[in-house]
Amino acid sequence: MTSTPQESSNLKRQLENSEDSSSPNKKSKTETTTENQSSWESDFNSLPVELLQTETNGTSPAPAPATPIDTTNVSNSKERDQDTSKLNDAIAAAGVDIQQEEEILLQQQLNRKSAEGMASNLKSVIRSSKSPPFLHNYHLAAFIDKVAKQNGIQQNFLMDGEMLELISAACETWLSNLATKTIILSRHRRRGIPVINKKSGSSSVPRSEISKELRSLALKQKEMEEKRVNKRVMLGLEKSTKDASKNDENGESKAGAEETLHRAANATAAMMTMNPGRKKYSWMTSSATAGGGSDFGKSSGGSSKDSGKHQSPIISVRGDNGLRFREIRSGNSIIMKDLLGAIEDEKMGTRNAVIKGYAKLKD
């Protein structure tokens, strides 16, 4: 395409206007560059000659000599920091006496040590003088742990020694009270209440109605037994006392006694011949046997006569001692009834024990 002369003239005008507008910017740029060059030249001129020479030669600059450190100033500053007089002055100005505070602290430490020593000595004395526990800690802790687990509690009771000691002491006190009540009930069971006679002032223990009835029954039984024995004597089934005395006079009883002694002597002699190594007694000799045997027979006869004199006719025939007074089998001991009576007074947690006790009494 070919441009017209008018268009070319317009383009020239636009170029001229753009150059006129950019001329002040160019001037400012040139001015700034000239200012920078002048500042660089002034800085370069201010540098020392030695530095310029080393830079031009290509070698590294020599190190400058180190300035000496003043140690006196450092030590003085440390002494100032550690000066106790100034610190004391500041504390004294605050109203605090350091020496008095140190003495108080020292006294407190001594008192604390002495108190700890006394406490340890006291604990050792208490442990040495303390009696062993009534219940063993291991078994008691195992029993409490079993009951606690049944109620949903998980705890190690063996670690708590004070609790175990308290429970052991409580059990000991409860059992001692129970034993005391049992002894009191046993005494009341065996003894009546003494009745004091107002006229004479004497006291007597009345017998119970049961003991009176038992004694009357025993007397009746004795009378019936005597009647029965008399009937047997009359019928000739048993020998009377007169027949027994006649036999004694005739020597039948003596002959029987001598016969038994002879048998016993033969048995001992046979035993000694079978075992000759055994010890021999003096009465086994020929001289001692006769005398010993005769003396023994006489003594036995005398004792039988004496016993016959003291015994009643029916007792001598029957060989019975007659009526005996009733004696308590238990004596002064404690029986199950006493213990059950003491347990019933507790009324708390003793139901199963009472049931088992009465079941044993029934058996």
Swiss-Prot record:
Residues forming coiled coils: 207-232
Molecular function GO terms recorded: DNA binding
Statement: the UniProt record of this protein carries the keyword ATP-binding: no
Official protein name in the record: Transcription initiation factor TFIID subunit 4
Name of the encoding gene: TAF4
Any one annotated GO CC term: transcription factor TFIID complex
Residue ranges of every copy of the Histone-fold domain listed in the record: 141-216
Cellular location(s): Nucleus
